[in-house]
Amino acid sequence: MPTINQLIANPRKIQKSRNKVPALDACPQKRGVCTRVYTTTPKKPNSALRKVAKVRLTNGFEVIGYIPGEGHNLQEHSVVMIRGGRVKDLPGVRYHILRGVLDTQGVKNRKQRRSKYGAKRPK
């Protein structure tokens, strides 16, 4: 515990919170080009093959984005839009790829929560 005189000499430093999505440059979304599309396994105790893509953004950052939903049409050189939002069981994945935007198709046969997966309203 510092004394009053010590606090007058050097006041307490305000702790800055670190940015959780540095590649977005304070933008809601960013556009980028897929450089690699692959699957990876989550950390314990989960087990799956999660679909992810390495994306080179317009500002030069290279980030890993998660591809949500069942099935996708992404391949190398696909132009995608990313948003912030990490995937808890995939270390290093801090962004989500938006479905139904640019080259990414929406999820087929999606009935509920369609807007999150870029699916049109079924007839």
Swiss-Prot record:
> Does the keyword Zinc-finger feature in the UniProt annotation?
no
PROSITE patterns according to UniProt: RIBOSOMAL_S12
Q: Would the keyword Ribonucleoprotein be found if you checked this record's keyword annotation?
A: yes
Coiled-coil region list? none
List the SUPFAM superfamilies hit by this protein, alphabetically.
Nucleic acid-binding proteins (SSF50249)
Q: Which family does this protein fall into?
A: Belongs to the universal ribosomal protein uS12 family.
Q: What is this protein called?
A: Small ribosomal subunit protein uS12
**Native source species:** Methylobacterium sp. (strain 4-46)
